[in-house]
């Protein structure tokens, strides 16, 4: 199977031409576009192969959690798009486990302290509401979502022993994904969590993620972690590999 992995297209700022022709499966690891616009784009541009679609934080901008998630799932029905949010799908003998994931704000210490810092600095907590109250999303909310997703993922991997397993999240599972120049910044705890113990326990074959606009590729044990972000259309070239295909 030939898998094309991309994240962070950020089409709300402009759309790039991408060739998906030589892939058997496309994985979009979050921040494709706002709301259901990314789903509409996939329907128009990637019609001949399955697409696994993960929500990033930006899908929720100008929307609400979980209302936007429900809208995206509904928009994907009866199409070639599989939305994974705390959900696993088996395809040609490979199990794909997907979630936005968010973070636990615990990279550097107290999740309360760093949650407060990140809530003040991240646009997520100004741009996203929560339903049914329509009050602003808070760091405690995404912390709770992260904990639920982590529990689900551990259970899903536990039940998938003996299979080839690929985990797909928007947020990163290790500080190793953070560029060196940002590794000690408090706000980095809104980009990654330390899930290396989970990786080492279950050793999925791959963990694909996005959110961080710098490509990375490294191993934790036998698991290869890959981030291949396109980034904003007006950003300086970040090393994104337009031709990256993972063959399994």
List the model feature ranges, each with a label.
Residues 79, 179, 185-205, 212-248:
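Binuclear metal-dependent phosphoesterase catalytic core
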Residues 97-166, 171-182:
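Active-site-proximal loop/helix segment associated with metal-binding centers of metalloenzymes
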Residues 1-4, 88-98, 219-224:
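Beta-strand-turn-beta hairpins that frame and shape the catalytic cleft
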Residues 53-59, 64-125:
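A basic- and aromatic-enriched beta-loop-alpha substructure that forms the phosphate/nucleotide-
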Residues 1-54, 59-68, 130-135, 139:
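N-terminal active-site segment of His-dependent metallophosphoesterases
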Residues 76-81, 152-164, 198-207:
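A structural motif corresponding to the C-terminal end of an alpha-helix
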